[in-house]
């Protein structure tokens, strides 16, 4: 069971709502994923209409909403969007995203830390999307973020865990849940993140852009479960030489004696 702030989750797979061909496909894919937390960009949601084609299926399925501040270019924009989301959606949960460069969508560490500190003071449960920077993640933890969401690779790149070495440090040091976000392009990437000890992963493009998003959502569900089980079971350590699984030494000695 994963606990973040005041909520508990059976599923360690969080999902996004963008890039799906239509809202029905989105709803079916999220259902098959087993996800209990879905993020959505405020700019894509009619926050004054609870029957919005993104909100309605999520709410009816009991999926927790995680509005994000995608599109915010600085802390001021993100804080404004956060308060708007809380008033309209009735949730103080927030995925904090600040990326001023529209081409690469790299998160701004300075503005993210400043916004996170203020939003925590304002009573938000803040989950910041950030670089896989161990020092930054520790600072975000220290200002009160409920979890950290370091990137595996650039958003939508499907490159996997390019930042693996830094993710491992973050996971080893963190005292709050670590959710690997961005760049996860295949179920194997998600499984590996879980094997490293990540508490959860967030996947959007790899599911939404698949030839069969519903089947791919199911594949990610199974991969996350397998990766977590492997981590909890204790993976065998790596060695630089061969180790026979069925040594014949004693058997041969007996035969030759």
UniProtKB/Swiss-Prot annotation:
Enzyme class at the top of the EC tree: transferase
Source organism superkingdom: Bacteria
Database matches in InterPro entries: Aldolase_TIM, Thiazole_synthase_ThiG, ThiG
EC number: 2.8.1.10
Catalytic reaction equation(s): [ThiS sulfur-carrier protein]-C-terminal-Gly-aminoethanethioate + 2-iminoacetate + 1-deoxy-D-xylulose 5-phosphate = [ThiS sulfur-carrier protein]-C-terminal Gly-Gly + 2-[(2R,5Z)-2-carboxy-4-methylthiazol-5(2H)-ylidene]ethyl phosphate + 2 H2O + H(+)
Annotated residues for binding of 1-deoxy-D-xylulose 5-phosphate: 156, 182-183, 204-205
Subunit structure: Homotetramer. Forms heterodimers with either ThiH or ThiS.
Similarity-based family: Belongs to the ThiG family.
Described purpose of this protein according to its UniProt entry: Catalyzes the rearrangement of 1-deoxy-D-xylulose 5-phosphate (DXP) to produce the thiazole phosphate moiety of thiamine. Sulfur is provided by the thiocarboxylate moiety of the carrier protein ThiS. In vitro, sulfur can be provided by H(2)S.
Protein's name according to its UniProt entry: Thiazole synthase
Gene name as annotated: thiG
């Amino acid at each position: 069971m994963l606990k973040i702030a005041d909520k508990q989750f059976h599923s360690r797979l969080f999902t996004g709502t963008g890039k799906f061909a239509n809202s029905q496909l989105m709803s079916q894919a999220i259902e098959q994923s087993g996800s209990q937390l879905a993020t959505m960009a405020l700019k894509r949601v009619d926050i004054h209409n609870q029957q919005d084609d993104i909100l309605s299926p999520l709410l009816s399925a009991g999926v927790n909403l995680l509005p994000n501040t995608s599109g915010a270019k600085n802390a001021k924009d993100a804080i404004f969007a956060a308060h708007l989301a809380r008033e309209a959606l009735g949730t103080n949960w927030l995925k904090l995203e600040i990326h001023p460069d529209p081409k690469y969508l790299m998160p701004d560490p300075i503005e993210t830390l400043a916004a996170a500190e203020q939003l925590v003071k304002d009573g938000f449960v803040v989950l910041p999307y950030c670089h896989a920077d161990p020092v930054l993640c520790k600072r975000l933890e220290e200002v009160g973020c409920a979890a950290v969401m370091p990137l595996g690779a650039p958003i939508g790149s499907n490159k996997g865990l390019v930042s693996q070495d830094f993710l491992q440090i973050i996971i080893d040091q963190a005292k709050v849940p670590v959710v690997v976000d961005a760049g996860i392009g295949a179920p194997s990437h998600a499984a590996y993140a879980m094997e490293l000890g990540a508490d959860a992963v967030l996947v959007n493009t790899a599911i939404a852009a698949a030839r069969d998003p519903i089947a791919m959502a199911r594949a990610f569900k199974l991969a996350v479960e397998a990766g977590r089980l492997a981590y909890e079971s204790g993976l065998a350590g790596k060695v630089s030489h061969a180790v026979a699984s069925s040594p014949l030494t004693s058997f041969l000695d007996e035969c030759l004696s």
